[in-house]
C-alpha cells in the first residue's frame, strides 16, 4: 500500500441495498501523483488537489453542450481525446460518463513518422507538423496513413463499448478533441468511416476571451485543453 495513492468518498445509500452506502474509491500508483506534483511545482505553482481524468472530462463536456443535440440531456454522446502518447475514448449518457477506454496512440506517433520520413529532429518535426512546409508527398505517405490509424482506433473503441454490456446505445455524435483534432477534415473522415456524426470539440467555444488573449492561438489550442478545462471547473474546499 505504500506504493499506492488512494482516496474515497461516500456517495450515499445504495439503490440496491438502502441499508448500505455506495462508496467511490480511486487509486493509482504513488509515482503517478508524484510526477504531476513535481510538474506543477516546477511551474512555480502549489498543487492542492489531484483529480481523475475521467471526472475532469465529464466536467469539461459541460462546456461543449452547445455542440450536442439537446445539450446532451437524455442523449448518448462520445468524446475521443487524442493526446501526445495516449488517447481516451469516453461515452456519456445524459452528461454522465458511462464508459471509458484508454489506449496507447497519439500525435507523438505522427511526429516520429515525420522525423523518420524526412530526417528531421524532434523539434523540427513538431514545428513542421503545426506550421506546415513539408514536402508534397506528406499527405499521401505520412498523414493519410496516420488518419487511417486514428479512425481505426475510434472504430475499435466504439465496438468495445457496444460489446461491454447489454442495452448499450450507439452514440449519436462523436466530439473529436486533442491536438490531432486540428488535422484538417479529420472529423469528417471519422464520421464517414464509423457512420456517426463527428465534429471537432471546442470547450472554449462559448467563452469570452480576454483582450490580452491571442484569439488565433486560443482557437487552435482549444480542443487540446479539454482536461485542463475540466480541472479548472472543479471545486474543492
PLM regions: where:
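Gly/Thr-rich phosphate-binding beta-strand-loop-beta motif of the actin/hexokinase/Hsp70
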Residues: 19, 67-99, 109, 114-117, ...
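Active-site neighborhood for divalent-cation/phosphate handling
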Residues: 1-65, 173, 203-209, 224-227
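Glycine-rich phosphate-binding loops at beta-strand->alpha-helix junctions
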Residues: 146, 169-199, 203-205
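Adenine-nucleotide phosphate-binding core of ATP-dependent small-molecule kinases
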Residues: 112, 116-117, 125-173, 180, ...
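Glycine-rich phosphate-binding/hydrolytic loop that grips phosphoryl groups
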Residues: 56-59, 181, 199-237
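Glycine-rich phosphate-binding loop plus the immediately following alpha-helix
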Residues: 31-59, 96-136
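A polyampholytic, Gly/Pro-enriched intrinsically disordered region
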Residues: 3, 68-77, 124-128, 216-229
Amino acid at each position: 500500500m505504500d506504493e499506492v495513492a488512494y482516496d474515497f468518498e461516500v456517495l450515499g445509500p445504495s439503490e440496491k441495498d438502502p441499508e448500505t452506502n455506495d462508496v467511490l474509491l480511486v487509486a493509482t500508483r504513488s509515482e503517478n501523483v508524484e510526477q504531476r506534483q513535481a510538474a506543477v511545482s516546477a511551474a512555480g505553482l502549489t498543487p492542492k488537489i489531484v483529480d481523475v481524468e475521467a471526472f475532469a472530462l465529464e466536467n469539461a463536456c459541460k462546456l461543449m453542450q452547445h455542440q450536442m443535440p439537446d445539450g446532451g440531456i437524455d442523449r448518448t454522446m462520445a468524446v475521443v481525446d487524442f493526446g501526445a502518447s495516449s488517447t481516451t475514448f469516453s461515452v456519456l449518457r445524459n452528461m454522465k460518463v458511462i464508459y471509458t477506454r484508454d489506449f496507447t496512440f497519439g500525435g507523438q506517433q505522427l511526429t516520429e513518422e515525420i522525423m523518420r520520413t524526412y530526417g528531421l529532429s524532434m523539434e523540427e518535426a513538431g514545428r513542421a507538423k503545426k506550421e506546415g512546409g513539408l514536402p508534397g508527398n506528406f499527405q499521401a505517405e505520412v498523414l493519410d496513413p496516420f488518419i487511417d490509424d486514428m479512425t481505426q482506433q475510434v472504430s475499435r473503441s466504439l465496438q468495445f463499448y457496444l460489446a461491454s454490456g447489454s442495452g448499450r446505445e450507439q452514440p449519436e455524435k462523436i466530439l473529436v478533441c486533442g491536438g490531432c483534432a486540428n488535422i484538417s477534415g479529420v472529423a469528417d473522415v471519422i464520421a464517414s468511416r464509423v457512420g456517426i456524426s463527428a465534429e471537432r470539440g471546442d470547450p472554449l467555444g462559448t467563452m469570452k476571451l480576454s483582450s490580452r488573449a491571442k484569439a488565433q492561438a486560443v482557437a487552435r489550442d482549444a480542443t487540446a485543453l479539454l482536461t485542463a478545462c475540466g480541472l479548472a471547473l472543479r471545486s474543492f474546499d
